[in-house]
Regions:
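Helix-to-loop junction immediately C-terminal to a conserved catalytic motif
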Residues: 51
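Conserved ABC ATPase "signature" region
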Residues: 135-167
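Conserved structural motif at the start of ABC-family nucleotide-binding domains
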Residues: 5-7, 20
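Q-loop/switch helix immediately C-terminal to the Walker
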Residues: 111, 117-139
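Conserved ABC transporter NBD signature motif
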Residues: 59-71, 77-89, 103
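Conserved ABC nucleotide-binding domain
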Residues: 89-94, 158-177
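The feature captures the beta-strand-to-loop junction immediately N-terminal to the Walker
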Residues: 36-38
Length: 183
């Protein structure tokens, strides 16, 4: 199996407090992995570093073989993300987490964020908006039918993967708490 996420020697300090200390982990394609620990152990901070919300004090994060977050020994941090040309990189001082999301990695939050008046299926479809490629003209004249069909098929596949396909037509708020978290 190939590595989809690699966290290498990541440390995150806030003043004198070390919230994450030399974190190393590797997640292979197809694996579902949980980060478990007591309150205050640094789980949320680790996710915030991995997804680009925080800049690490030390270490690097790789996603799908590309380095997306890196701290240089001199203390000058730079984040990297794919540029327009395949294989090229654009170096910026502080890209927002949406750049990392565009690469295909997103995170969930401790508080559930659902569109309460929407179905389970529609919640996932709405969340996939950053994966659509329709321009204004195509959307205005409903020329995006094929892409819409592809998005709907992908949503069905995702719901099947997490065991929510059977409740796809239910309102998101009608689900038990555990299933809402999965959604």
């Amino acid at each position: 199996m190939s590595s989809i996420l690699k966290v290498e020697n990541v440390t995150m300090q806030f003043g004198g407090v070390v919230a994450v200390d030399n974190l190393n982990l590797e997640v292979n394609e197809g694996e579902i992995v949980a980060l478990i620990g007591p309150n205050g152990a640094g789980k949320t901070t680790a996710f915030n570093v991995i997804t680009g919300v925080y800049q690490p004090t030390n270490g690097a994060v790789w996603f799908q073989g590309d380095k997306i977050v890196e701290n240089h020994p001199q203390g000058k941090m730079k984040k990297l993300y794919k540029g327009e040309e395949a294989g090229s990189y654009t170096h910026v001082l502080a890209p927002t987490p949406d750049k990392i999301t565009q690469l295909g990695m997103a995170r969930t939050f401790q508080n559930i964020r659902l569109w309460k008046s929407q179905t389970v299926f529609d919640n996932v479809l709405i969340a996939k908006h950053c994966r659509t490629h329709t321009n204004f003209l195509a959307a205005s004249f409903r020329m995006n039918h094929r892409e819409e069909q592809e998005q709907r098929a992908r949503v069905a596949q995702l719901l099947e993967t997490v065991g929510l396909y059977d409740v796809k037509d239910e309102l998101a708020t009608s689900l038990p708490y555990g299933k809402q978290r999965r959604l």
